[in-house]
Amino acid sequence: QVGADGDLNGMVWYNGFNMAEMGSGYGLKKLGLEHLHPIIARGILLDIAAVRGVEVMEVGDVITMADVTAALKAQGQSGYKMLPGDAILFHTGWDQYWIVDNAKYNSGCPGIGMEVARWIAGGHAGVTGFDTWPGDAVPNPDPDCAFCVHQYLQTRHGIINQENLNTSLLVDA
């Protein structure tokens, strides 16, 4: 749901809808969350901060497939095979800034790159979850990749992105 200029009226949403077709300042006419069924899925939380040896990743850090593989191994899930509909959650530690330091939280964030996005889409995951606000690394080190993860997962593949999750509660459990 992101266009070339960010979240503006010229953007294209899933199935090619534009903002005029989607809704107005008063809400959505199409593709609103009220149309989603409850999500019941097998899920896996990938603690990327832990495999990087940090409490919190840095602004612009890109999560790679090497990170995913290392997290699966560290969590005793080396044999993990994604099944259609799986929920793939990422912990970067960024959620520690939510409400406590909104300027820092919104200044950018770590996130997945296109390599991981292709893995998610190729495995037909149904949902992704992030402790960041976009899921993408911001700023992205690739100048041609402004919210390209959003565009790829949501617009092209219809994968639901859950953002601003408190994944710290899960890794601490």
Over which residues does each language-model region extend?
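Active-/binding-site microenvironments in catalytic and ligand-binding cores
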Residues: 1-173
